Amino acid sequence: QVVMILSETFSDPTRIPGISFSTDPIPNIHAIKDTTTSGLMLSSGYGGGTANMEYQALTGLSLSIFDDSLIIPFQQLVPNQKNPYAFNQIWNNRYGADGSDAVHPYYQSMYLRNVDYKKFGFSHLRTLDSTPSIKHKDTIDYSPYVSDEEAYKNIIDLIEKQKHPQFLQLSTMQNHMPYTNWYIDNEFVGADTSTGLSADEYQNLETYTKGLNLTD
């Protein structure tokens, strides 16, 4: 099985100058990095445009090769293509229509994902409002978004259901902005040793970091 997880807004906050914590927010990920092949990635987009990262990851095509008028391929390009290519089709060619499946714990029409994933040849795009919809969709404390733990459970269900190899795509939602103070007993409020931030910036940072810790 090959599972590609695009973890919403994930980064290592300990690498940002001026940002520090008295405890490591992502110790498990750091430990895994130390014992296996790992590295750093420079994102081609910041502050929005999740679907553009998705498009580039699934197709291997950089937005830099397109004209500047192409802002969001998921909305402007893929719906108008006859046979758009994506990596999942390698599994489809070998195992048939159910060679690839996708999960996004939000709404299917966002960025026209329901149209695009069908064009790419995924057997389903399983969302909050799709048919079939995702089974696991609990949130954490006051967060409006499905937790990463629940999102992973949906992927595990697909792995256990299918006997042959498949390509599974997951785009998570837990750490999506805005970063309102929605986690109860957030230990990173006390562990935040960063300096020079406004009250709003501290709240955003500490909520975001708690989300990363939950992902970890």
Feature map (PLM): residue ranges:
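Solvent-exposed soluble domains appended to multi-pass membrane proteins
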Residues: 1-7, 12-216
